[in-house]
């Protein structure tokens, strides 16, 4: 269920302050955050945020297309190694 429009988007306060200061001073440093739950708002566009995926920080450059999404959507937490192969076909090919 989506968030109520009257509440507005959720952004962690400490993250918003860091991004506001970076925009104000023109600082291009990467901002580290554990706040995967924060919504990307238009003020974030042009900033690089390093989002924690549970193991390491993934740098995410924020563009206009990302506005309205959550930061966590751009830092996957799971690694997909593929499904197990068919063992019969390997044996069959050896004939």
Curated annotation (Swiss-Prot):
InterPro entries: Ribosomal_uS19 (IPR002222), Ribosomal_uS19_bac-type (IPR005732), Ribosomal_uS19_CS (IPR020934), Ribosomal_uS19_SF (IPR023575). The keyword Ribonucleoprotein applies. This is Small ribosomal subunit protein uS19. Signal peptide: none annotated. GO terms for cellular component: cytoplasm; small ribosomal subunit. Keywords: Ribonucleoprotein, Ribosomal protein, RNA-binding, rRNA-binding. Protein S19 forms a complex with S13 that binds strongly to the 16S ribosomal RNA. Belongs to the universal ribosomal protein uS19 family. GO terms for molecular function: rRNA binding; structural constituent of ribosome. GO terms for biological process: ribosomal small subunit assembly; translation. HAMAP family: Ribosomal_uS19. Pfam families: Ribosomal_S19.
